């Protein structure tokens, strides 16, 4: 008789990070330093608003001051850059989160060079991207890939020498999470839509990270017995329900651990964002 895999939720991980941050922020506030995050959002996309609500709540619970700059959808490139420069120069702001993707008429390839790298808490700047690739811990890796690694560490998954397969090669999750896992001494394989025998390659992994953005694509043929599965996907299924890239019910009898969607990786991401704001604040104040 097979035993069902353990569903590993993000909340205990997020709570532990938050507890540590509350102590750190208390010490900073006692010295007259108030960590502050500014969110720069164009328009009002529902997924942006959903993440924003979670981020504001998390930061406020920790004691981080927050501000949201909601910009018109028809904002020009020049106007957007002016706003970003103003926030860069504001000494009271320690962290900046720019919601992406930006509308098509705004050129991210230009704008990403404008954000101050020392305030760039979700890895928009090429300088922080380069630090991720180099394994340089002084920068700010993207929050979601960092959340993936934090979850694995929290649940004592031994990454050293483990075969880890990442499904997806985006700069948002796939590539950066692969680099972060390499820094943890995992043996990493990156798969994508052109990978031959995709399920066969995935089924060799001790740890499988699904970040392809296709609802319930990963079934039991993708996982080996006892694998750990981290589901980064956020999709909507035919019934209109939120679901991940993994068909959890199909794989639950084979895996040892799996993150749910919702209540998995996403719930840790906002804690990482807060952690990066506090780190930025300390660096800017030589703490």
Curated annotation (Swiss-Prot):
Keywords from the UniProt entry: Amino-acid biosynthesis, Histidine biosynthesis, Hydrolase, Methionine biosynthesis, Multifunctional enzyme, NADP, One-carbon metabolism, Oxidoreductase, Purine biosynthesis
Catalytic activity: (6R)-5,10-methylene-5,6,7,8-tetrahydrofolate + NADP(+) = (6R)-5,10-methenyltetrahydrofolate + NADPH; (6R)-5,10-methenyltetrahydrofolate + H2O = (6R)-10-formyltetrahydrofolate + H(+)
Molecular function per GO: methenyltetrahydrofolate cyclohydrolase activity; methylenetetrahydrofolate dehydrogenase (NADP+) activity
SS bond partners: none
Positions of NADP(+) binding: 168-170, 193, 234
Amino-acid biosynthesis listed as a keyword: yes
Tagged with keyword Oxidoreductase: yes
InterPro entries recorded: Aminoacid_DH-like_N_sf, NAD(P)-bd_dom_sf, THF_DH/CycHdrlase, THF_DH/CycHdrlase_cat_dom, THF_DH/CycHdrlase_NAD-bd_dom
Involved pathway(s): One-carbon metabolism; tetrahydrofolate interconversion
GO cellular component: cytosol
Xref: Pfam families: THF_DHG_CYH, THF_DHG_CYH_C
GO aspect biological process, one term: L-histidine biosynthetic process
EC code(s) of this entry: 1.5.1.5, 3.5.4.9
Recorded superkingdom: Bacteria
Family recorded in the similarity comment: Belongs to the tetrahydrofolate dehydrogenase/cyclohydrolase family.
The protein's role, per its UniProt record: Catalyzes the oxidation of 5,10-methylenetetrahydrofolate to 5,10-methenyltetrahydrofolate and then the hydrolysis of 5,10-methenyltetrahydrofolate to 10-formyltetrahydrofolate.
Summary of subunit composition and partner proteins: Homodimer.
PANTHER family (UniProt xref): C-1-TETRAHYDROFOLATE SYNTHASE, CYTOPLASMIC (PTHR48099:SF5), C-1-TETRAHYDROFOLATE SYNTHASE, CYTOPLASMIC-RELATED (PTHR48099)
Name of this chain's protein: Bifunctional protein FolD
Organism: Clostridioides difficile (strain 630) (Peptoclostridium difficile)
Source taxonomy: Bacteria, Bacillati, Bacillota, Clostridia, Peptostreptococcales
Name of the gene: folD
């Amino acid at each position: 008789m097979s035993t069902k895999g353990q569903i590993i939720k993000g909340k205990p991980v997020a709570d532990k990070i938050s507890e540590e941050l509350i102590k750190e922020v208390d010490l900073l506030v006692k010295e007259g330093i108030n960590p502050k995050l500014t969110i720069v959002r164009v328009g009002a996309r529902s997924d942006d608003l959903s993440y924003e609500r979670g981020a504001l709540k998390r930061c406020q619970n920790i004691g981080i001051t927050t501000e949201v700059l909601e910009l018109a959808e028809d904002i020009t490139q020049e106007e957007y850059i002016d706003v970003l420069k103003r926030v860069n120069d504001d000494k009271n702001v320690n962290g900046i989160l720019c919601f992406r993707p930006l509308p098509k008429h705004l050129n991210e390839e230009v704008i990403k060079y404008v954000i101050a790298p020392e305030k760039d808490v979700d890895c928009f700047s090429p300088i922080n991207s380069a630090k991720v690739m180099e394994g340089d811990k002084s920068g700010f890796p993207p929050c979601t890939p960092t959340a993936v690694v934090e979850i694995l560490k929290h649940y004592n998954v031994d990454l050293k020498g483990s075969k880890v397969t990442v499904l997806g090669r985006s700069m948002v999750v796939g590539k950066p999470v692969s680099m972060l896992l390499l820094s943890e001494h995992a043996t990493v394989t990156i798969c994508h839509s052109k990978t031959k025998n995709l399920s066969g390659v995935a089924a060799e992994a001790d740890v499988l990270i699904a970040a392809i953005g296709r609802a319930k694509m990963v079934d039991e043929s993708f996982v080996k017995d006892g694998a750990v599965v981290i589901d980064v996907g956020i999709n909507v299924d035919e019934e209109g329900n939120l679901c991940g890239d993994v068909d959890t019910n199909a794989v639950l009898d084979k895996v040892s651990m799996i993150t749910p969607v919702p209540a998995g990786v996403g719930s840790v991401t906002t804690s990482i964002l807060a952690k990066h704001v506090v780190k930025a604040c300390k660096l800017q104040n030589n703490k």
